[in-house]
Amino acid sequence: MTFRPLLDRVVIRRAEGNTQSKGGIIIPDTAKEKPQEGEVIAVGPGSRDESGKLIPLDVKIGDTILFGKWSGTEVKIDGEDLLIMKESDIMGIVANTVPTAANAA
């Protein structure tokens, strides 16, 4: 099935949560917190202003984003658990920067 979000909505694939704590303790599924990070897999065309002009979204497919703990609506599409939320629920885009030798020193 193909799903196309409307207006300023985006479809998010939630990032995988950690299965082990920093101290090495294995965390059971029932105690895991859901990650607040995910990948944008579909975007709507944008919202409209008072004059009817289309305002495009800032996020695009493939962006890694951060969102609030209670943001979005959980849905299952083609057997995959996804989130649908408005762009305003997204806190920011995570920049995938690779550390250089100068930055590492």
Swiss-Prot record:
It holds the Pfam family Cpn10. CDD domains: cpn10. It comes from the Bacteria. It is found in: Cytoplasm. Keywords: Chaperone, Cytoplasm, Plasmid, Stress response. GO terms for biological process: chaperone cofactor-dependent protein refolding. GO terms for molecular function: ATP binding; metal ion binding; protein folding chaperone; protein-folding chaperone binding; unfolded protein binding. GO terms for cellular component: cytoplasm. Its main location: cytoplasm. SUPFAM superfamilies: GroES-like. PANTHER family: 10 KDA HEAT SHOCK PROTEIN, CO-CHAPERONIN GROES. Together with the chaperonin GroEL, plays an essential role in assisting protein folding. The GroEL-GroES system forms a nano-cage that allows encapsulation of the non-native substrate proteins and provides a physical environment optimized to promote and accelerate protein folding. GroES binds to the apical surface of the GroEL ring, thereby capping the opening of the GroEL channel. Heptamer of 7 subunits arranged in a ring. Interacts with the chaperonin GroEL. Belongs to the GroES chaperonin family. This is Co-chaperonin GroES 3. It comes from Rhizobium meliloti (strain 1021). The gene is groES3.
